Amino acid sequence: TDVKVPVENRVGEEGKGWTYAKGLLEHERTGLAGLSRSLVALEQLKGNAESITRGNGTLMDDSGYKAKIAELEIDLMATEYTELRSLASASAGEELGPESSILKLKGTEIQQRIQKLTVEASGVFASAWGDKPVGPYFSKGGMAGYLNSRYYTIYGGASEVQRDVIAKNVLGLTRSKTK
């Protein structure tokens, strides 16, 4: 509170720093959702699963794996529609709001689920390390990708923070104060 910043070095109006920071975070979170990357990755995953033989069919013939892919597609489509509504609002000059938290939360969780299903499709080959691929070509770096995806839900505001934003701004809930 005792910081002195020369007027010529200020960005925007005095006392509005947090408002500007929140606006930047909303845009950052929308981008971190990575929905276009997830759409491409999911299509690649489905193609890869079609190339893996399991029993008398492919991995995509496995009802359990197919159900996981279907759930992921549904979540991705619903999140994409949220993004499109958000973009339409922004195009109309409206501010982004808690939608950016929803997009960041759902988008990064979807990215993690894609990585997890890639590891599942790769089987033991996902753990292979080094420059020489072992097993299916897409399994190279599978486990590393999965483990690195853990931080997706941390940067740009941890998932717990996003849930708090959603609870407060969408659902009107407040945190109970325990003594």
Where are the predicted features?
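Glycine-rich phosphate/cofactor-binding loops in nucleotide/flavin-utilizing enzymes
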Residues: 15-27, 32-35, 125-179
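Hydrophobic alpha-helical scaffolding
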Residues: 11, 31, 35, 59, ...
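Residue-level recognition of specific faces of alpha-helices
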Residues: 41, 68, 99, 145-148
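C-terminal helix-coil-helix/basic helical segment that borders enzyme active sites and/or dimer interfaces
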Residues: 54, 63, 77-134
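Glycine-rich beta->alpha junctions and the first turn(s) of the following alpha-helix
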Residues: 1-79, 152
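Tryptophan-centric aromatic hotspots in well-structured domains and transmembrane helices
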Residues: 18-20, 48, 81-84, 107, ...
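Short, well-ordered loop/turn and helix-capping segments at boundaries between secondary-structure elements
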Residues: 5-6, 26-27, 51, 84, ...
